[in-house]
Amino acid sequence: MLKLHGFSVSNYYNMVKLALLEKGLPFEEVTFYGGQAPQALEVSPRGKVPVLETEHGFLSETSVILDYIEQTQSGKALLPADPFEQAKVRELLKEIELYIELPARTCYAESFFGMSVEPLIKEKARADLLAGFATLKRNGRFAPYVAGEQLTLADLMFCFSVDLANAVGKKVLSIDFLADFPQAKALLQLMGENPHMARIMADKEASMPAFMEMIRSGKR
């Protein structure tokens, strides 16, 4: 059985978790916060989450894990059959990660954990996020899903990145990135109605106290 190592507060962990649930695959969840301790680095070379444990060993990096699951496991397809359309899904996924998720992450400390972020970092995040959302508007199809009519891997990155980025915009940057992006708002609502999302969000809520205690203590 596949084992998913990580924790339910992590958006990247939840992307993989949603893929496994959508495909109807059995899997075991293993709490793992990563870090630089030797035992953590044996599981994840960079000490990051998530990690997928397979019969052949451990895999890190979310996009790699998602591709591995899609290539090796049965169940609902999360990539189209056509090679070009597959590439478009991966293109959208990578654009959302590079130009929305990662810039927003630079302000997570202030947005979600009550810490301060340097003004220059916030200025760069604002510019990068404006460009990132403009990119998504140009390239996303939203029919109603990011890449078209079917749920794909791009939607997993979308639903666990765009909501956080918009929260950063409102709380830290004084901007609503979705104010003129009704298609993205509609897709977030649609994804929120997915029954698997209810489980994921409940697990996230239940895990939050332990996660916050870990943050306060500085221990992993």
UniProtKB/Swiss-Prot annotation:
Gene3D superfamilies: 1.20.1050.10, Glutaredoxin. Residues 1-77 form the GST N-terminal domain. Its main location: cytoplasm. It catalyses: RX + glutathione = an S-substituted glutathione + a halide anion + H(+). It is found in: Cytoplasm. It comes from the Bacteria. Monomer and homodimer. This is Glutathione S-transferase. It comes from Pseudomonas putida (strain ATCC 700007 / DSM 6899 / JCM 31910 / BCRC 17059 / LMG 24140 / F1). The lineage of its organism: Bacteria, Pseudomonadati, Pseudomonadota, Gammaproteobacteria, Pseudomonadales.
